[in-house]
Amino acid sequence: GLGVVAVTYGAGALNVVNAVASAYAECSPLVILAGCPGEVEAHSGLVLHHQVRSIDSQLRIFSEITCDQVRLSNADTAPEDIARVLRNCREYSQPVLIEIPRDMTLAPMREVPVLAPRSFNQEAVNEAADEWLARIHAAKNPVMVVDVEVRRFGVEARVAELARRLQLPVLTTFMGRGLLAEDGVDLHGTYLGVAGAPETTALLDESDLPVMLGAILSDSNFGVSAQRMDFRRALIAAHREVRVGHHVYHDIPLAALVEALLERIPPQRTGTPRALPPQPDYPRGLVADDTPLCAGDLSRALND
């Protein structure tokens, strides 16, 4: 589904900038319905209440934190504009802005069409899948890394099946923690770099081929590595792009790549997974006493 927020022009819209920027960074689909001045007010020569620098300042600010924007100033083109923006919101899993001028709120218009999914080049998908599998089969220590886009695009079950067929150990990123936790894959926890368990960290740091699905290459996900990570040695599928070294296949949905890979790998008996790292000895047993509260007490309360 999509999140929706309706706000007033200027003050209302600017109050949600931080939340919208977070949604953009974390690939959360969100529709912002924002008011804006009508044609008469926009050309009155007066500075309007809640106007920042110009009438278009709101639109320009949100253009930095949304994947598509539209101002519904024309009732004839509004249905197609709305349909385009909503499709981009779903296909890119990022926020979009729909500005509604005051004098257009009651304007009649045609029904909004439902656009078919954006087309992609199946030959490019097939070529990318072949190149990925060749790299995976040639690697000595491949590891699969899954991130938030796997959940956003609804491919968690298919990615789990891919991990089982490839018999790869799986890590999640910090932003993707909790993914595939109950899907029966060879899951080794969340990669936290120098802050994580050494055995878990070594799986990625020492891998000759990280296979990254839906991975956001951010500092919170990979910036805590003891050494600068060379993503050129990785296979990366995210933001409708598929990367193999210096090769980039544009406009390929994550789901299309996963399906193409599964078509090339027949189901097989599951091999013996590598041993999971030992469970950390988390602090437990909160004692109700008169000593000052500390961070360790909160950890014990949560673990209990």
What are these regions (language model features)?
Residues H50-Y92, L204-S207, R240-R243:
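Conserved thiamine diphosphate
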Residues P37-G38, I100-L106, V148-V150, G176-R177, ...:
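Glycine-rich beta-alpha junction loops
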Residues G1-G38, S44, T200, E206-S218:
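Thiamine diphosphate
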Residues S73-D76, V96, E111-V112, M229-D304:
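Phosphate/pyrophosphate-binding active-site segments
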Residues V148-A237:
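Glycine-rich, anion-gripping cofactor-binding loops and their flanking helix/strand elements
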Residues D56, A78, R84-A138, E263-T270:
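Conformationally flexible catalytic loops at phosphate/diphosphate-handling active centers
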Residues G38-I61, A181-D186:
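Active-site-proximal loop->helix
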Residues G1, L86-Y92, A128-P142, L162, ...:
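Glycine-rich phosphate/diphosphate-binding loops that line cofactor/substrate pockets in enzymes
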